[in-house]
A protein has these predicted regions:
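Core recognition of P-loop NTPase motor domains used across DNA-transaction enzymes
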Residues: 39-50, 59-60, 71-72, 91, ...
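Long C-terminal interaction/binding lobes of large macromolecular proteins
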Residues: 127-139, 144-197
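S-adenosyl-L-methionine-dependent methyltransferase catalytic core, i.e., the SAM/SAH-binding region
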Residues: 8-16, 27, 33, 64, ...
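Signal for well-folded cores of large energy- and translation-related assemblies
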Residues: 16, 34, 49, 62, ...
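Cys/His-rich Zn2+-binding cysteine-cluster or related metal-binding knuckle/ribbon modules and their
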Residues: 2-8, 17, 25-90
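Extended interfacial segments that mediate partner engagement and assembly in macromolecular machines
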Residues: 26, 74-139
Length: 197
């Protein structure tokens, strides 16, 4: 016999599909939705559907946007590209208000153990941007872990023939950590003290 009636069980099941949300947390979320006024629940549902309908990837950098090209790509210095693993890394860096260039979101890193190779992430698109000839520096801001380092070294090797400076974020970001969770001061210092690859 099921513990929850079908609509509640279904909602709990959907919430538990989110990263970091176990059954207990999913139950709390479901109970909260049940207790919400219908207008708030409808606004919550509309926000979810709005994201799915309106948000797409920038055709230049791969970050989230509602347009063909994101605001960063439309208004920033294209001679400086910061390469990141995923869009949430862009958000973490943008919070600092330090970086004045544009981004390139790989949507992953090279991870042979997970079956992710160079052709599975947006490396070809980065090389196409470099072929335009306007880029002076590429900052590789992948996470300081095995996959992030492997991706950084692979990119440095590919970028070398373009006569573009390739740098990596400096020390201060702990090995094995994720950029998204790095505090603002540490992340800002890592940008200022970035290293050549």
């Amino acid at each position: 016999m099921e513990i929850f009636i079908e609509p509640i069980g279904k909602l709990i099941n959907e919430f538990s599909k989110l990263p970091g949300v176990g059954k207990k947390t999913a139950q709390r979320y479901a109970y909260k939705i049940i207790d919400m006024p219908e207008s708030e629940a409808r606004a919550f549902a509309d926000a979810i559907l709005g994201v799915k309908r309106k948000v797409k990837y920038c055709k230049v950098c791969g970050n989230f946007t509602e347009e063909e090209t994101c605001a960063v790509c439309r208004m920033r210095d294209h001679s400086l590209i910061c390469v990141v693993k995923e869009p949430k890394d862009v958000a973490a860096i943008e919070k600092l208000h330090e970086f004045k260039g544009v981004y390139h979101v790989l949507h992953g890193v090279i991870d042979p153990l997970s079956g992710i190779g160079p052709n599975d992430i947006r490396i070809r698109e980065l090389l196409a941007r470099l072929q335009e000839g306007n880029v002076k520096e590429v900052i590789v801001a992948t996470n300081p872990d095995v996959s992030g380092d492997a991706t950084a070294m692979y990119l440095a090797k590919l970028i070398k023939p373009f006569d573009v400076t390739v740098t990596r974020l400096a020390h201060g970001i702990p090995i094995g950590s994720e950029i998204e969770y790095t505090d603002d001061v540490t992340l800002a210092r890592a940008f200022v003290e970035r290293n050549k690859l």
